[in-house]
Amino acid sequence: MSTANKLGSPVAAENRPSDFIRDIVAKHVAEKKYPQIHTRFPPEPNGYLHIGHAKSICLNFGIAREFGGICNLRMDDTNPTKEDVEYVESITEDVRWLINGWADDRLGMKPKGKTPDTITSNGKQDFYLAAVSQQRAAGILPADHTSSSPATRANEDGPADKMSAARLEPFYASDYFDQLYEYAVALIKKGKAYVCDLTPDETDEYRRNAKESPFRNRSVAENLDLFTRMKNGEFPDGTRTLRAKIDVASPNIWMRDPLIYRIRHAEHHHTGDKWCVYPMYDFAHCLSDYIEGITHSICTLEFEVHRPLYDWILENLDLPRPLPHQYEFARLSLGYTVMSKRKLMRLVNEKLVSGWDDPRMPTISGIRRRGVTAEALRAFAYNIGITKYNGLTDVAVLEHAIREDLNKRALRRLVVLRPIRVVITNYPEGKTEELDAVNNPEDPNAGTRKIPFSRTVYIEQDDFKEVPPPKFFRLKPGGEVRLKYAYIIKCDELVKDAAGKTVELRCTADLDSKTGGATASRKVKGTIHWVSAGHAVDAEVRLYDRLFTVPEPDSEGDFKKHLNPHSLEIVTAKCEPSLKDAQPELRYQFERLGYFVIDSDSKLKTQNSKLILNRTITLKDTWAKEAQKT
């Protein structure tokens, strides 16, 4: 799968993924049904994005990238009591990170503070094109920008890009509140909407029983008066709603006179206290798509039953064509994970994790902090594909994509997680050798580095057994192993403490067995990693694992009972000295152990330096191995 795409050029058909939605888009492109393909990613800013959102981001931005289109980032912010600027900022950062270098030239954003009223003369021109014009006039986009994208290549990677990014912001459904209100008034005037005085519980009961509201046949004049007074703040929350007048007996409950406006006396993160009536999702969604010129509105399957309402609202407002159309695909359900915002919020609020970006969380910020790359997430989304059928995706599919990606990019390093001291008695005291070690065997251009070797080294406790099991090929009394990049050593003596625990091994080395030596080709069955004791750098290593112990933790009962008590273990490791120069988010393979990343909690190059590393993933699927035993 190619990740490079010339700015402004669609991806060749033979290089595009194929699924039922892309097939529809390809047909529309061939028919020239729309001037340009225009998708959107519209999260509600009431929580952090998770890996399920990553699938949708990859689909919507992927289609824009492949067909030379645009994908708007829009905040679906119609519920003031649950939304916050914190979530807007995290969502924007996560989206930019995930599409960086892949589809960032397709990112639809707008000049900060601009709305349709301030950009266009009539409130219904192509908002996106107007935004591009404003950016060019402001110097945010160059005049010869070859793409019609309203974003620059605005990432977190450089001062110029940061400056441009600071002058852009997502689209907001709340920017359209004036227009949405006028659309609601238009429905009232056509006899297609009415103000209802039923309580929320009564409304639910009436709709369930296909029963007509006693307020359904109010006059247009009365409805207009009441709706105006609702807007003016004359009524308390929950006392009145505006409902679409469709069919109370419809077999589709979403068409049974659905609510399209409700009263909420609450401060809004974007509009302040200007409004006390707010549109419902189904009303704002389709009209926001229309205002922005969206062609393909792609949702998950639970919104399939909402599509008739989406179409009804657009058609009954007599809007100029073309109209957007909604398409649905199966959402991501991932094994050993929960993705309900409510349940993730419980984990955070009950301090069962350290926060939204805890590396065990399925949030994009958590996954990123764990060391997973955007490329790995996009590869995962590509591998699972797009279907119409819900099903559980094995987490091993995600883990395979992560390992495959990191194997190619991660620098190799020697680190001992649980050290035991080894003294090589026939190696000269005070001597240090610089040995050559490969940085990445998958990448010849990564070159080599020097690692120090001395008389005393650390090895893993698990690499020594006083009484070894069958087929144990690592170090044991009288046994030999090769220290990677160094010598073959033989265990001659054990040193134990007062409790009888082995605390030191005394070994001799075959000093001719190093590369280039007379016995370098001598074979032994085991090769282990090590770190020179006198040169080791201490690090806090956080060994993260799956957060839950079962594939479907929320299938029944309290999901928290399936939390993995061993999902985090913290050890003080001994690292080769090159890691003291590491920077946050650099990724490594600790040889024979797994993939690790420098955590943002690290205090680097300070007087009280502290190196902290997170385990991204083990080298092999240890869960599959355990499952085979049961």
Where are these regions (language model features)?
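Intrinsic disorder/low-complexity segments
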Residues: 3-4, 8-10, 109-167, 602-610
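N-terminal catalytic cores of NTP/NDP-binding nucleotidyl/phosphoryl-transfer enzymes
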Residues: 14-26, 30-93, 268-300
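Secondary-structure transition/capping motifs at alpha-helix termini
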Residues: 30-33, 62-70, 94-107, 190, ...
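Conserved short loop/turn motifs at secondary-structure junctions
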Residues: 42-46, 74-84, 110-112, 168-178, ...
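Active-site cores that bind ATP or allylic diphosphates and position pyrophosphate for catalysis
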Residues: 79, 85, 114-121, 125-131, ...
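A glycine-rich helix N-cap at a beta->alpha junction
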Residues: 88-123, 168-174, 184
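Core subunits and conserved enzymes of cellular information-processing
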Residues: 303, 307, 311-313, 375-378, ...
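Long, charged, mostly alpha-helical binding arms that flank functional sites
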Residues: 322-401
